[in-house]
Design a protein with these regions (language model features):
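A surface/extracellular/periplasmic glyco- and lipid-processing/surface-interacting theme
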Residues: 1-201
């Protein structure tokens, strides 16, 4: 199931957001109401493969909330072009509260401000692949990749990668020496963006 050819008509564009000037990548939506019938009509598998039954990331212990090895970080600013996001650390709750364009971003059902234990900023190579403006993102990462792991009041510069030629493989995060890092348990936000568009304070 993918949105490039939109097989099954599961994906669309929010015309209101387009009219408001949002960048194309911020206007897509997925119509989940059509998913069950599409899965059934295509005879798609609904059980997890064995290699997907474990955790997606290497985690710290249940009671551990560790600060990344690096600098202090209580504020993250990410410039996405037409939109910007910010994350401000709430030390009492040990989460980063999300803002969008200077306003608190809230859950549509609960009204609560979005909060994340972990924030990743990954800087893959990004290019425009067609006249519509679709982006080509290099998901592979590797030893020359750049990223940042923010959690518990700190930020650490990292390397990230996926298994070569396997877009379905999990992301892996490493310190600058190449050792895989464990992350804190909790909600995680992953930003993919052009290089040098984020600041950490």
């Amino acid at each position: 199931i993918e949105g490039i050819t939109n097989t099954g008509g599961l994906f669309g564009r929010d015309q209101d957001r387009l009219n408001q000037g949002y960048a194309l990548e911020h206007t897509g939506y997925f119509d989940g109401t059509k998913l069950p019938s599409y899965i059934e009509s295509q005879g798609l598998r609904t059980d997890l493969k064995e290699d997907k039954k474990g955790p997606a990331f290497l985690f710290n212990g249940l009671e551990e909330q560790l600060k990344p090895e690096g600098s202090d970080c209580t504020n993250v600013q990410i410039n996405f072009g037409a939109q910007s996001s910010a994350f401000t650390y709430d030390a009492g709750r040990k989460v980063y509260l999300k803002q969008i364009n200077g306003q608190a971003q809230t859950d549509g059902k609960t009204g609560n401000q979005l909060a994340f234990t972990n924030v990743f900023v990954l800087e893959p190579d990004i290019s425009v692949r067609d006249s519509v403006g679709h982006k080509e993102i290099d998901w592979d990462g590797g030893p020359d990749s750049t990223g940042y792991y923010v959690s518990n009041g700190g930020v650490q510069k990292i390397i990230w990668s996926k298994d070569p030629n396997n877009e379905n493989s999990y992301l892996r995060f490493y310190d600058q020496s190449g050792q895989e890092i464990a992350i804190n348990r909790g909600k995680t936000y992953i930003a993919l963006n052009y290089k040098n568009q984020a600041t950490f304070q």
